[in-house]
Amino acid sequence: MTGKIQKIDMLIKNAKVFNNGETAVIEDVAITAGRIISRGQQINDQGASRVIDAKGLWLMPGLFDIHTHYDLELEIAPGLPESTRHGTTSVVIANCSLGLAFGAQRDGKFDPIVACYARVENIPKSVLTHCADNISWSTPQAYLDHLDQLNLGPNVAVLLPHSMLRIETMGFEGSITRDPTHSELQAMKDALGDALKLGYVGLSTDALPFHYLAAQPHCDKTIPTQFAQYREIKALTEVVREQGATWQATPPKDSVIDTLKTFMLTSGRLHGRPLRTTVVAALDVANNWKLSRLAKILARLLNSPLIQGDFHMQALGARFKIWSDGAITPIAEEIPELRRLNETDLEDRAGRLSILSDPDYIRDFKAMWLKGKHRWGISRLKRKLNIEDYAFNRKLADMTVELCPQKNWQGMDFQSVFDRVLAITNDCLNEELSNTEQQLINSDFSQVKDEADFMLQMLRSFDTDLSWSTITANRDLKTVRELLMDPLLLPGFNDSGAHLTN
């Protein structure tokens, strides 16, 4: 199109345009009233209110982030600039069974927003309490109405969160202590069906061993969705199937049999119609090489002509790097000895120090930390073969000090710091020490004999003032690309907005 003058709000010129599966082309794109009105070479710019020269830049449809935890962030920053700046124009919220569809759900004794989010997302309870105080709705319809009133940046699609659905139907305590009655299960099915008709895009559930409550006396319990038996999940997903909606789920990580049984619910052959299912996550876990292969095998099996499923695991297109503050980290939750520290409130330094100083706890921690690292046995063999049970590999060389009161340790990996501590205590470090480092070693680290002693003392000395990072999955970018480009997997699991420090 050349020569023709047309009214254009925005003309983007000379961009490399990617659209669907088409070969990328260099062209102009004209936009009026928020809609593309023409594409082509050398569009006349005389009628354009704004012209952008995009030479050397890419122009593409907005990205769709299918796995976010922006539920609370939307209430504070509804524009979601951290996503829109990357070109994301649509997000899905209320993943992994947690969301705000039913409001604050307080019952006078328990505060579900605080209980469910504090440890899962590492958010201080005071912040969560303030968020819950400002919630004015109590039904799925009212929540959608509320979202419509926000100045949203991207489009927002909402799942109905199963943990909150259980709380709404069974009460908080009932949702984590018993199965639903027949009438309660029917009530959940009815509420889910009604929500899907309102515009909720599906149901989210969760079975990962990282998601625990922050509500006494139930800090040893996982979030409500994980107490659902198979028959409950089957009944609810049947409602999702009937309405052509989506089930977002996570697998029972430690049981291949339970995983296969659960995800056979996607089968059209067994259930008359495929259930659209998206699952977290197809990751190349550093501590267990089998899991990424299992994800691909599962995808091929469940989508095969034999099973006739509609099953897509989400693949993350980046390294899975986790930041932690002292012992406060999501990956600690599946290890009982580390979980005890996570059960304390974020602000409770004294509580964590008391645990870390208890002789029985010290014994248990050291046994956990050194498991598989010494003496031959099944644990040592599994570590050698890289098929361990936990996502966190407890390898000092893989853990990097990001922030620390002892400033010269920042940027070092924990193994280097440990070696330095031993060199100082054995008086064989060939460099001059600062007074502060020497005093720290003398007062806190002089009795360190092994790496378990060292880890315990790092947590005692610095608590949450010690920030560190580790890459738990997707270290090999070649494997990441293979997963991302697999036609049976979906780009996703960004976990945007999840885990405050991530």
Question: Can you describe what each PLM-predicted range is?
Answer:
Residues 2-10, 17-62:
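Histidine-rich, glycine-flanked metal-binding segment
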Residues 143-147, 153-155, 159-169, 176-182, ...:
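Active-site neighborhoods of metal-dependent hydrolases
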Residues 18, 23, 36, 43-44, ...:
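Short, glycine-/Ser/Thr-/acidic-enriched flexible segments
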Residues 76-190, 194-202:
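Divalent-metal coordination cores built from histidine and acidic residues
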Residues 105-116, 217-222, 226, 262-266, ...:
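Short low-complexity, flexible loop/linker segments enriched in glycine and/or proline
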Residues 115-132, 136, 174-182, 215-229, ...:
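Glycine-rich tight-turn/loop motif centered on a GG-T
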